[in-house]
Swiss-Prot record:
GTP binds at residues 26-33, 73-77, 140-143. Residues 189-235 are annotated as: Interaction with GNB1, GNB2 and GNB3. Farnesylated. Farnesylation is required for membrane targeting. GO terms for molecular function: G-protein beta-subunit binding; GTP binding; GTPase activity; phosphatidylinositol 3-kinase binding; ubiquitin conjugating enzyme binding. This is GTP-binding protein Rhes. GO terms for biological process: locomotory behavior; negative regulation of protein ubiquitination; positive regulation of phosphatidylinositol 3-kinase/protein kinase B signal transduction; positive regulation of protein sumoylation; signal transduction; synaptic transmission, dopaminergic. A lipid is attached at C263 (S-farnesyl cysteine). Keywords: Cell membrane, GTP-binding, Lipoprotein, Membrane, Methylation, Nucleotide-binding, Prenylation. Pfam families: Ras. GO terms for cellular component: plasma membrane; synapse. Induction: By thyroid hormone, efaroxan and glibenclamide. The lineage of its organism: Eukaryota, Metazoa, Chordata, Craniata, Vertebrata. CDD domains: Rhes_like. The keyword Thylakoid does not apply.
Amino acid sequence: MMKTLSSGNCTLNVPAKNSYRMVVLGASRVGKSSIVSRFLNGRFEDQYTPTIEDFHRKVYNIHGDMYQLDILDTSGNHPFPAMRRLSILTGDVFILVFSLDSRESFDEVKRLQKQILEVKSCLKNKTKEAAELPMVICGNKNDHSELCRQVPAMEAELLVSGDENCAYFEVSAKKNTNVNEMFYVLFSMAKLPHEMSPALHHKISVQYGDAFHPRPFCMRRTKVAGAYGMVSPFARRPSVNSDLKYIKAKVLREGQARERDKCSIQ
């Protein structure tokens, strides 16, 4: 199955097996959108704008292979529990963000981690131990004074101890401290190309008038020694029906992969 990303002189088709979704969760005002902004365009926005739910898409050409990463920047208020559950079900990699100067936001991350494990276990034959979920616990605002800290590093690290698919980072979206390193480790845990990390690929900008004719991106579709990334300018959140189909297809692919593994072992 192939996903068509744009039309015109150049059509970008991404194999379904190379399409992933990153879900960013956490309480309000902890810096989720700032971290996403750093990931997408390397910028930090000083002005706070409450997020209801933002959807972004980044397309990569990595040594000639096409990849797609959808980014779901969720609301900290979670007014619609059913939508929160659907967002978790569709997620492949997760970033749980709290503020180092807010104990309440850390408690919310602990609740979210538990909810993710419970929800995703439904896709793994209801066995939590079978769920391998690449996840980063992210303590943001480490540029603030230690006097403001309400969450000790050792306490936060307990959330990831003993889980090779979970890591803890203290970052500053404002100062861009440890942000690139965090994404590198997250993609490594998910067995995704390292070049998907912000610092490891060339960024291609698409102007408004060129959005449906991304010729510079197409010119790099051959097998070349390089990695390129482009933020889709007109990304739209898929419908609920599309998300449900996505979940079904993903479960089917994972089941087929497990069967192949069993056959190879036997």
